[in-house]
């Protein structure tokens, strides 16, 4: 059994990405894995990084990652890139 941290970045609960998230989580749980999921849009995550010290949200996500075995990112690709909210999350949470 693994603990999986899922980071989801799509604004619509009716999107193809929402279906991917739901199916992934249901299947992983059926296989005995533990899921911890954040929805960046519902959480209103601030993706702008200006070199400041991590805020409480960033520190919380980092702690949750430390307790996980795997990270899964679920987001659309728009113009060959992930949405800014996901890219900002990567910069703020995973950056040194």
Describe the role of every protein-language-model region.
Residues 1-96:
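N-terminal beta1-alpha1-beta2 submodule of the flavodoxin-like/Rossmannoid cofactor-binding fold
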């Amino acid at each position: 059994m693994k603990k999986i941290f899922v980071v989801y970045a799509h604004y619509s609960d009716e999107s193809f990405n929402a279906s991917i998230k739901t199916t992934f989580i249901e299947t992983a749980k059926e296989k005995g894995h533990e899921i911890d999921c954040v929805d960046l849009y519902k959480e209103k995550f601030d993706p702008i990084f200006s070199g400041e010290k991590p805020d409480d949200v960033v520190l919380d996500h980092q702690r949750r990652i430390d307790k996980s075995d795997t990270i899964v990112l679920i987001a659309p690709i728009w113009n060959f890139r992930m949405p800014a909210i996901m890219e900002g999350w990567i910069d703020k949470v995973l950056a040194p």
